[in-house]
């Protein structure tokens, strides 16, 4: 397919997903579909609605906005409470969807969104932390920091503190990124480990470093996007902190790029083991790289030369995994459904573990990032 054909196909693909989804039954939330349980406030839908709102900002097409508003309004009540959301669960994943409330509040001015923003902020006020001050990923994972959590919570936290709290928590957010760099970055590759256990008690944690054993692509992807999204929400008056995260972003993109597959432009599920039996070129993490770089270039955080790396990743993913079914419907494949550490399934962070998780089509953990990158491609064409 030509690049133009891919972009046209993606426009049709979003229409297809929206037409077949609602807040009660989002077709892109494969975990929910498989569970058969009612939908609840979650980060997966949050990622998809963020993409829809980004497409609205880029194209001005009201269908993306009206769908997003209806979706969020299913959960957000007039008093600012959020159906199915419990702040005391202390799960950073649940903060992610909160980013979309800022956008809807700015567009519609409805105070229920402002109240709901405060509801989510209340979680972070008492979210348990490591001794060094990083949010625990979840209350059920004590003393643990996961890369995923930076994307889930830090952009919301930075925006709230910048807009509504006189920047009081902004340096706290910055310090959490610096702690992650200190503990989770591998000096040899420049890649970051998926998880870190400050207590060194978990079976997956290295007894010396506290880190999990491998570099999972999507975790790296969430982390790269987190830095871009935090910079976007950060006041440049925080001169040293702003430049500190920008330098961390640039170095990370340079280091990650070294692992880009030359032929396809994609990245491997476990990044530093290309071609190993069981490993595969994975959609979601590749799309997150493309989005982080394209947005970083547009906003001036990254040099323009990096855009070519992102475009190669974006179009390479579409060539590899975007296809039409015989009935004309579209699908995006190559998406790792889920990966974590610990828990009841004894997830040990080994290569065998990361290779064993299901690979699915049309899940928002891959679709959302690809559509965010698509919105950036469209925005770049307008400039």
What residues fall within each predicted segment?
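Oxyanion-binding "anion nests"
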Residues: 224-274, 278
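Acidic/His metal-coordination segments adjacent to aromatic residues that form catalytic metal sites
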Residues: 76-83, 134-139, 199-213, 268-278, ...
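Core register positions within helices of long alpha-helical scaffolds
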Residues: 51, 58, 100, 107, ...
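Inter-helical turn/loop segments and adjacent helix faces that build the functional surface
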Residues: 59, 108, 160-171, 230-243, ...
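Short, contiguous, pocket-lining structural segments
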Residues: 145-152, 165, 169-172, 207-223, ...
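CBM-like carbohydrate-recognition segments
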Residues: 2-44, 63-65, 74-92, 96-98, ...
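Long, well-ordered core segments of solenoidal/helical folds
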Residues: 6-26, 66-83, 115-134, 167-196, ...
């Amino acid at each position: 397919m030509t690049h133009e054909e891919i972009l046209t196909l993606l426009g049709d693909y979003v229409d297809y997903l929206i037409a077949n989804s609602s807040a009660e039954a989002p077709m892109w939330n494969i975990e929910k579909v498989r569970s058969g349980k009612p939908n609840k406030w979650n980060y997966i839908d949050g990622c998809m609605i963020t993409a829809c709102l980004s497409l609205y900002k880029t194209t001005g097409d009201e269908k993306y906005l009206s769908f997003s508003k209806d979706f969020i309004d299913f959960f957000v009540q007039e008093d600012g409470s959020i159906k199915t959301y419990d702040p005391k669960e202390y799960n950073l994943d649940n903060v992610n969807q909160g980013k979309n409330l800022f956008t809807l509040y700015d567009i519609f001015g409805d105070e229920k969104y402002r109240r709901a923003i405060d509801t989510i902020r209340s979680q972070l006020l008492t979210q348990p932390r490591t001794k060094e001050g990083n949010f625990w990923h979840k209350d059920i994972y004590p003393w643990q920091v996961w890369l995923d959590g930076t994307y889930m919570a830090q952009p919301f936290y930075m925006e709230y503190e910048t807009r509504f709290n006189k920047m009081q928590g902004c340096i706290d957010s910055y310090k959490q990124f610096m702690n992650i760099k200190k503990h989770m970055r591998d000096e040899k590759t420049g890649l970051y480990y998926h998880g870190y256990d400050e207590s060194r008690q978990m079976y997956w944690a290295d007894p010396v470093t506290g880190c999990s054993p491998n570099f999972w692509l999507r975790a790296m992807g969430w982390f790269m996007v987190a830095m871009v999204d935090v910079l976007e929400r950060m006041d440049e008056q925080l001169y040293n902190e702003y430049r500190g995260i920008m330098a961390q972003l640039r170095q990370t993109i340079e280091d990650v790029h070294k692992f880009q597959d030359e032929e396809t432009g994609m990245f491997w599920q476990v990044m530093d083991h290309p071609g190993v039996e069981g490993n595969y070129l994975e959609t979601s993490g590749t799309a997150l790289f493309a989005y982080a770089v394209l947005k970083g270039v547009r906003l001036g955080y990254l040099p323009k030369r990096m855009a070519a790396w992102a475009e190669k990743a974006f179009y390479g993913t579409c060539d590899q995994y975007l296809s039409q079914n015989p009935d004309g419907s579209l699908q995006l494949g190559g998406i790792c459904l889920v990966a974590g550490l610990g828990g009841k399934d004894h997830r040990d962070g080994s290569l065998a573990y990361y290779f064993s998780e299901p690979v699915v089509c049309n899940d928002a953990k891959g679709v959302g990032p690809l559509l965010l990158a698509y919105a950036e491609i469209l925005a770049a064409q307008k400039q």
